[in-house]
Every structure is written in structure tokens, then in C-alpha cells.
Design a protein with these regions (language model features):
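Conserved short loop/turn motifs at secondary-structure junctions
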Residues: 1-2, 31-32
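Short active-site segment of divalent metal-dependent hydrolases/proteases
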Residues: 2, 6-7, 122
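Histidine-centered, transition-metal-coordinating active-site segments
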Residues: 13, 25-29, 36-334
Length: 334
């Protein structure tokens, strides 16, 4: 449930833009070499530092296995604005990854590996379903993909629904997509059983009593055949949806909103709400926060403050971010 707590407004484009702003220092305004951002890392920061249930301790006291699974449900790398990959690494004061085995790209527990593949299946099929519903993707193009054709030829598929017999109703199309989800899950279950049996025969069952007694290999995933077909469908999904005119226009607006909000907060910290500033200064109660103690120059030099700006923006919803941009930049004459 917690793996996407760190997601930004406007989805993955918001995540990428916030990561660029942090790592590149708002295009050279501050030194961004020590900063990075990715939603899986931010999810762990939320449950370790931002969300508090008592005054004595930060975070909500989740186990290492849960937090490690959250951070590794997706990749540990990201790209800068030039498309160059780099390892995501938060400042030590911002995130503690001790015991996470960051040298391994996959989760050290089977539960964490299950979350990662489940997220991959859900993201792929939900994107496809949304694209078909929004008339961005042709259902015929979707049905012609190798993965979908293979599913339609299996016993799992209801022979009562033939995609070659037009027209299919909305419910029939949805049934095919939902059936594809089941097909992918079945493939993962079967392939993972073999991988797990081979791993434990060679290495034994990990005891988890130390960082060295964990699952050193990824044992949960697709079969080789279905992996290739799922990757092919994902590439086509990107072409149909991610790079479409409609999504590109929406992404440009999202990047602009997030950039301008970040600039406003950094250049004019007093535009931040009291509860953010109070938390930065270590005050438990934002009521009556004294804004006269704020030194803009000191805040701009403090990595902790820059991380707080990032936290605040990352926690916004799409609508909140759009309204905040309006509040920051559009005069209200009413």
C-alpha cells in the first residue's frame, strides 16, 4: 500500500521534473550535486520522516523488509535532463537506507519482489485500458500484439469473446484486458516457482538474520517468452500514449507548473505555508509561527530547506499544484 506514497503531482512527468530540478540545482541556481529525487525513495522518506504519529519519534515504525520493498518496487536509477542515467541517492540526513542492500537492484525478500512485478503488470495494463477508453489506442492494434494474441489462444480466455468479430462492447473489451492481467499473473506464478526452486536448491532458504542471508537473485518474474512480449507491448504503449500529442501537451504544462512553484518557494520562502516553515524550524505547532525569524539567505544555503521544498511539492495532488501555481503567479482582483 505504501509503495507509491512518494508520487508527485502529474505522475511520472512530475517525478522526472522534480528530480531534474533537485539534481541540477534549479538549472545552476544552487549546487544540486548532492540531491536527487525518485518516488520510490520519497515513499520511504514519507514513512520514515514526514509522517509522524507521536512527538518522540519520526516516522511510523515500519519494518526494514517493508521499507526495503517500497524502495525497490521500481528502478534505483533515473535520468537527468540530457537522458544520462545516474544512481538515485538522497542525503544521509534525508533518508536512511542502512540494511537495504542497495547493491542489489531487486528486493531482498520475496514479498518485495512480488510487489515489484505486480506494479509492473498493473501499470502496463491500466495504461492500456485508459488509452483504449480515451480513444488514444486502437483496440485492434492492441489485440494484434503478440502477448495479447497468445493470451487469446489460451484456455484462460473466454471463447465467447472473439476480438475478430466486430464490434465488441465496452464490457467485452474490458473483460479481455482483465483476462490478460490474469494471464500475466499465472505466467509469473509458474515461472517464479521454477526460479525459486532452483535458487533454494543452490543457496538454501535465506534466514534474514544478516544482510548476507537474503535473496541475492530476483526469483519472481515473467517467463523469458512473456517477458519479451510484455516489453514489446510496453514499448508500443509508450508510442501510443506516452509520446502522443495529448499526453505531450499535458506533460509540458505539468513541467512548467512544478518548475515555477519550485522557483517561487526557493526565491521567496515566505510564500510557503506556516506548517512547512514551522516543521523546518523544529516547531511542533504551526499556530502562531513567528515569521520574523526567517532569513531568506540562510534558508537558500541550507540543503535541509531545499529538501523541504521538494517534500512539499511531492506531496501535492494535481489540482492542488495547479491551484498553487495560480495563487503564486496570477493576481486575484476579486
Amino acid at each position: 500500500l505504501g509503495h507509491d506514497l512518494g508520487h508527485t503531482p502529474f505522475g511520472h512527468i512530475g517525478e522526472r521534473k522534480l528530480g531534474e530540478l533537485m539534481h541540477e540545482g534549479l538549472k545552476g541556481v544552487f549546487d544540486g550535486s548532492q540531491f536527487s529525487f525518485k518516488h520510490n525513495f520519497q515513499s520511504v522518506r514519507v514513512v520514515e520522516y514526514i509522517e509522524n504519529k507521536c512527538d518522540e519519534f519520526p516516522g511510523i515504525n515500519l519494518t526494514l523488509a517493508v521499507r526495503e520493498g517500497m524502495i525497490k518496487h521500481t528502478k534505483l536509477q533515473t535520468k537527468d535532463s540530457n537522458g544520462v542515467k545516474y544512481d538515485v541517492e538522497y542525503e544521509k540526513s534525508a533518508l536512511n537506507t542502512t540494511g537495504f542492500r542497495m547493491d542489489l537492484p531487486h528486493s531482498i525478500t520475496l514479498e518485495g519482489q512480488v510487489v515489484a512485478i505486480a506494479d509492473e503488470i498493473a501499470q502496463l495494463t491500466h495504461d492500456i485500458e485508459d488509452g483504449i477508453r480515451g480513444n488514444i489506442i486502437s483496440f485492434d492494434n492492441f489485440a494484434s500484439c503478440e502477448l495479447v494474441k497468445n493470451y487469446l489462444n489460451t484456455a484462460q480466455h473466454s471463447n465467447d469473446i472473439n476480438p475478430n468479430c466486430a464490434p465488441l462492447s465496452y464490457n467485452q473489451r474490458s473483460q479481455i484486458i482483465k483476462g490478460l492481467v490474469g494471464y500475466l499473473i499465472s505466467d509469473v506464478a509458474k515461472a517464479s516457482e521454477s526460479k525459486l526452486e532452483a535458487y533454494e536448491k543452490k543457496h538454501g532458504i535465506p534466514s534474514f538474520d544478516s544482510e548476507l542471508s537474503v535473496y541475492e537473485e530476483n526469483c519472481v518474474g515473467f517467463s523469458e517468452k512473456v517477458k519479451l512480449q510484455a516489453d514489446d507491448l510496453a514499448k508500443k504503449r509508450d508510442n501510443w500514449i506516452i509520446f502522443s500529442k495529448e499526453i505531450s501537451q499535458a506533460d509540458s504544462k505539468a513541467e512548467y507548473f512544478i518548475t515555477q512553484i519550485f522557483k517561487a518557494y526557493y526565491k521567496h520562502p515566505k510564500e510557503l505555508p506556516d506548517y512547512i516553515l514551522a516543521r523546518y524550524y523544529g516547531e511542533k505547532d504551526a499556530d502562531g509561527f513567528d515569521r520574523t525569524i526567517i532569513s531568506v539567505e540562510e534558508l537558500q544555503r541550507d540543503p535541509k530547506f531545499i529538501r523541504f521544498i521538494c517534500d512539499h511539492i511531492a506531496g501535492m495532488s494535481d489540482q492542488f499544484a495547479a491551484r498553487e501555481y495560480m495563487n503564486l503567479y496570477i493576481p486575484n482582483y476579486h
